[in-house]
Curated annotation (Swiss-Prot):
One of its GO terms (molecular function) is double-stranded DNA endonuclease activity. It is an enzyme of class 3 (hydrolase). Keywords: DNA recombination, Endonuclease, Hydrolase, Magnesium, Nuclease. A low activity DNA endonuclease probably yielding 3'-hydroxyl ends. Involved in RecA-independent recombination and horizontal gene transfer. It comes from Escherichia coli O157:H7. Its EC number is 3.1.21.-. GO terms for biological process: DNA recombination. This is Recombination-promoting nuclease RpnD. Belongs to the Rpn/YhgA-like nuclease family.
């Protein structure tokens, strides 16, 4: 008799059946929605490890995970079958987490691989009937309408590489960050002096942010021209010369200690 490490006898019985390929094939042929079933080559069923570890290193475990080839033979589909003897208001979100974990593992060894379809299925036989909760995870939000707009569309993108500099300098306290990170790969940042002076004069960054900014330029930009860059910057804004030179000297000393 096969032993399963499970929390309940319900789980043990469920696994003893659904981990058998012929039984799993019958289950999917009967219960998978027709349009999804037609995508799957159920003769290619392969049992996969259903244990995962998420980013916080906590065990994430689903009951049963099968992979199948597509009928076109150009990819894989995974079917997650979760067993529940009690209803769970957040079951849909839990199934989404399982699905994301399967997708992550699929692309771990080759980031260029397309994401696989993962079909989550819930087998329920609890005392409360019918199953009382939606299995659309978007319904779990307090505002499902906004959740659908957010998660069914492309996410907001701030592509600073296509934003004109004249527009960036109007972005108040985030302008320095955006301007430098847009142009850092030029290596020579001397052409940005005029715009940087305007932003620094308006006190759009505190000492901590200016320190981080200059350190970033030293580490990522043209190190050989850093002193020239600082000299030109301070010559354009003599009222801030002492402040900037103090920060630059501290960065230089820290860099020397790190390299000694």
């Amino acid at each position: 008799m096969t032993n399963f490490t499970t929390s309940t006898p319900h789980d043990a019985l469920f696994k003893s059946f659904l981990m058998h390929p012929d039984t799993a094939r019958d289950f999917m042929e009967i219960h998978l929605p027709k349009d999804l079933r037609e995508l799957c080559d159920l003769d290619s069923l392969k049992l996969e490890s259903a244990s995962f570890v998420d980013e916080k290193l906590r065990a994430l475990h689903s009951d049963i995970l099968w992979s199948v080839k597509t009928r076109e033979g150009d990819g894989y589909i995974y079917v997650v079958i979760e067993h529940q003897s009690r209803e769970d208001i957040h079951m849909a979100f839990r199934l989404m987490r399982y699905s994301m974990a399967v997708m992550q593992r699929h692309i771990e060894h080759d980031k260029r691989r397309p994401l696989p379809l993962v079909i989550p299925m819930l087998f329920y036989h609890g005392s409360r009937s019918p199953y009382p909760w939606s299995l659309c995870w978007l319904d779990e939000f307090a505002d499902p309408t906004t959740a659908r707009k957010l998660y069914n569309a492309a996410f907001p993108l701030v592509d600073i590489t296509v934003v004109p500099d004249d527009e960036i300098v109007q972005h108040r306290r985030v302008a320095l960050l955006e301007l430098i990170q847009k142009h850092i790969r030029q290596r020579d940042l001397m052409g940005l002096i005029d715009q940087l002076v305007v932003l620094l004069v308006t006190e759009c960054a505190n000492d901590s942010q200016i320190t981080a900014l200059l350190n970033y330029i030293l580490l990522t930009g043209d190190e050989e021209r850093f002193n020239e860059f600082i000299s030109e910057l301070t010559s354009r804004m003599p009222q801030h010369r002492e402040r900037i030179m103090t920060i630059a000297e501290r960065i230089h000393n820290d860099d020397c200690r790190a390299n000694s």
